[in-house]
Structures are given as structure tokens and as C-alpha cells.
């Protein structure tokens, strides 16, 4: 069951104790944190987000700064919530070594428990290209994902404007240049493809097609492609099971992309 509390009082937050260990629980607000274990540390008041996973994993992030967590405890750990002197105290204690993180929330802005249905990794499918090398592999193994009859003949091919990701021929024998983007493509991708096409056209003295291959493109990018006589091929990621057996994208990589 999902429960979302906006600017709750401490006693309301304490009710989420029942969900700890069974559902994902998230608290966000102004807090201080203490770590006690092999060393000791204190984090002063700041806006932070605390995440408690059912497997016992605990993570505390500063909401406005760097990607590394302020504190964290791996599983097996046990979390608890209590109210002390009007303050919400979230405690994470490791079960295998004597270490704990104690977070003192002076003001909780948001508290929620998430449904556990469909939350298991074996039920999820991770569908993001981890790199442009993944895209090349997909095209190499099945060139028809670009279009029927496409025949790739080279990767990382140099031209006067740089290095083209993939080149090949269509079923009519025309030379084709592919520019690959694993995330949403912007105008810079369209401009780069145009430069490659013009360079190959000048070097080869023949008609050259240019295709931007990406999961999606911005509106400005689409208009620029049309202006230059270039094409866009939507290539969906190959689903990868999030089973821990493959290297996953970081959040930074996931969010990276061209938004122009």
C-alpha cells in the first residue's frame, strides 16, 4: 500500500515504522546525521533524502549537492523510526558489524512508503543503452533494425569532419552514414551528422544518406534534420534484466543527454 505524507507531524511519520523492512520508505526534510562505528562523523543541518529498502539497505543523500551519499548502510541493516523531543529520529543499525547511522529530522517535508508489488528486480526490465557500443552491437548483429537491406561495412570511420560511428550501404547501393546517440538527441547531433554527410559526399563524389539513430529526438533536432535532408531512425533499447549480473548505468549516465 502506498502512503504519501506532505509536511507531516512527527507522530504521523512514526506510523511508517510498520512499513520498514517490508516496503521502500522515503523521508525528505531538514536533518542532521551522525555515524558511529569504525570512525565517527557528524553532518550538520541540510535538506536531505533518506531511503530505506526492504532488504535493509539505507542511503542518506544531500538533496542539493554531489552524487555521493552523506551516509549509507548496506544490507543487512535494520531501520527504525521514533519521536524524541518533537524530532523524528531515523536509525539504521548494521546487523553484522557495530555501525549505525542516526538521522535527526527537525522538519519532515515529505514521507512515503511505496508499494512492494512489482518492486522485485526479477520483475523489472532495464531498457537503456549503456553505451553507443551497445547500439553498434545491435546494428552489427541485425542490420535490419536500421532498415531492410542495410549493410554496415565499417565502424569508427574517419572523414574530413571527424569519425563516423557506422557507415554502410542501403539496398539500393547508396552510401549511408549513421550517427548514434544512446539518449535523446539534440541539435548538436543533427549538426554533426550533417558535417559527416557533407565530408563523405565531397570525398566520395556521390550521394550520401545520413541517418541519426536514437531512442528520441528534440523538436529542434527534428526540424534541423528535415532542413538538412537527413533522417531519424528510432532505435529502442534492447531490454536487459536488472539481475545484478550486468553493469548498470549510474543515475548520472541515465540523466545525461542532449536537451537542446
UniProtKB/Swiss-Prot annotation:
Disulfide bonds: none
Molecular function terms, GO-annotated: DNA binding; single-stranded DNA endodeoxyribonuclease activity
CDD domains from the UniProt entry: NucS-like
GO terms under cellular component: cytoplasm
One Pfam family cited in the UniProt record for this chain: NucS_N
Chief subcellular location: cytoplasm
InterPro entries: Endonuclease_NucS, NucS_C, NucS_N, NucS_N_sf, tRNA_endonuc-like_dom_sf
Keywords from the UniProt entry: Cytoplasm, DNA-binding, Endonuclease, Hydrolase, Nuclease
Top EC class for this record: hydrolase
EC number: 3.1.-.-
Record has Hydrolase as a keyword: yes
Family assignment from sequence similarity: Belongs to the NucS endonuclease family.
Name of protein: Endonuclease NucS
Source organism per UniProt: Methanopyrus kandleri (strain AV19 / DSM 6324 / JCM 9639 / NBRC 100938)
Lineage: Archaea, Methanobacteriati, Methanobacteriota, Methanomada group, Methanopyri
Amino acid at each position: 500500500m502506498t502512503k504519501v505524507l506532505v509536511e507531516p507531524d512527527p507522530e504521523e511519520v512514526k506510523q511508517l515504522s510498520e512499513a520498514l523492512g517490508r516496503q521502500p520508505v522515503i523521508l525528505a526534510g531538514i536533518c542532521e546525521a551522525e555515524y558511529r562505528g569504525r570512525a565517527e562523523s557528524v553532518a550538520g543541518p541540510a535538506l536531505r533524502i533518506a531511503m530505506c529498502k526492504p532488504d535493509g539497505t539505507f542511503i542518506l543523500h544531500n538533496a542539493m549537492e554531489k552524487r555521493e551519499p552523506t551516509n549509507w548502510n548496506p544490507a543487512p541493516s535494520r531501520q527504525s523510526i521514533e519521536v524524541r523531543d518533537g524530532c523524528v529520529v531515523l536509525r539504521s543499525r548494521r546487523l553484522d558489524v557495530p555501525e549505525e547511522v542516526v538521522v535527526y529530522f527537525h522538519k519532515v517535508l515529505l514521507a512515503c512508503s511505496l508499494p512492494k508489488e512489482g518492486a522485485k528486480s526479477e520483475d523489472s526490465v532495464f531498457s537503456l543503452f549503456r553505451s553507443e557500443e551497445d547500439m553498434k552491437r545491435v546494428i552489427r548483429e541485425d542490420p535490419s533494425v536500421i532498415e531492410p537491406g542495410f549493410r554496415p561495412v565499417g565502424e569508427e570511420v574517419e572523414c574530413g569532419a571527424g569519425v563516423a560511428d557506422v557507415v554502410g550501404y542501403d539496398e539500393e547501393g547508396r552510401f549511408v552514414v549513421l550517427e548514434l546517440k544512446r539518449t535523446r538527441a539534440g541539435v548538436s547531433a543533427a549538426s554533426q551528422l550533417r558535417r559527416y554527410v557533407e565530408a563523405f559526399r565531397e570525398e566520395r563524389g556521390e550521394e550520401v544518406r545520413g541517418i541519426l539513430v536514437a531512442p528520441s529526438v528534440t523538436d529542434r533536432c527534428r526540424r534541423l534534420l528535415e532542413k538538412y535532408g537527413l533522417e531519424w531512425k528510432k532505435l529502442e533499447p534492447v531490454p536487459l534484466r536488472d539481475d545484478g549480473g550486468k553493469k548498470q548505468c549510474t543515475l548520472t549516465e541515465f540523466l545525461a543527454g542532449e536537451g537542446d
